[in-house]
């Protein structure tokens, strides 16, 4: 798999998290499969490829690819504004996290603990999701710049929804970190927009 394809998969995963956060905030509901895919990416160890981090199937990131395509196409009518805002905010927070080795160590330690929990409860159990959410709350949400999630307050005030949103933001920032480690940069979204779109269309068709 080419470097650009691997970068695109990781960036698509950032947008997948963003799209799931948006849907959850607006409707109060998301499917278990995409939630499980993104939570599983937080615990992926020594994957054979970038795609293996996300279950080995591009279909798992389809909504993310669509949201990313809407951002790159620059068509006001089809732009998914909130997912784009969340995705860009996650990329920004990842840059801040990169300067905090202590926080990265803490997140790693806490994820090790969650992995043990998963063996007992399963990946999408509410206790596991609450643990992912508390990692986000204790670390990334302490930064001055926070991600403001917009949606229906009836859904946002439900504690289980709030926990899922925080867990998804943690997963999105993990994917942002992977994207940058693979050589991704925001400049590519500006100067290589057409190339990215062409490759994205291939992923969506595949």
From Swiss-Prot:
Pfam families: DUF489. Transmembrane segments: none annotated. InterPro entries: HflD, HflD-like_sf. It comes from the Bacteria. SUPFAM superfamilies: YcfC-like (SSF101322). One of its GO terms (cellular component) is plasma membrane. Its main location: cytoplasm. It is found in: Cytoplasm; Cell inner membrane. It is a peripheral membrane protein. Keywords: Cell inner membrane, Cell membrane, Cytoplasm, Membrane. NCBIfam families: PRK00218.1-2, PRK00218.1-3. Belongs to the HflD family. This is High frequency lysogenization protein HflD homolog. It comes from Pseudomonas paraeruginosa (strain DSM 24068 / PA7) (Pseudomonas aeruginosa (strain PA7)). The gene is hflD.
């Amino acid at each position: 798999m080419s470097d650009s394809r691997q970068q695109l998969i990781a960036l698509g995963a950032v947008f997948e998290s963003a799209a799931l956060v948006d849907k959850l905030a607006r409707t109060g509901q998301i499917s278990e499969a995409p939630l499980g895919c993104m939570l599983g990416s937080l615990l992926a160890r020594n994957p054979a490829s970038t795609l293996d981090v996300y279950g080995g199937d591009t279909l798992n990131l389809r909504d993310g690819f669509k949201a990313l395509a809407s951002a790159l196409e620059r068509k006001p009518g089809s732009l998914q504004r909130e997912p784009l805002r969340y995705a860009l905010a996650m990329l920004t927070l990842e840059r801040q996290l990169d300067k905090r080795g202590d926080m990265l160590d803490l997140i790693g330690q806490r994820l090790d603990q969650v992995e043990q929990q998963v063996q007992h409860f399963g990946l999408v159990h509410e206790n596991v999701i609450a643990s992912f959410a508390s990692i986000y709350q204790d670390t990334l949400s302490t930064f001055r710049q926070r991600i403001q999630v917009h949606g229906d307050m009836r859904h946002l005030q439900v504690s289980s929804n709030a926990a899922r949103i925080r867990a998804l933001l943690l997963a999105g920032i993990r994917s942002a970190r992977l994207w940058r480690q693979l050589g991704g940069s925001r400049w590519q979204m500006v100067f290589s927009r057409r190339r990215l779109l062409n490759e994205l269309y291939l992923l969506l068709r595949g």
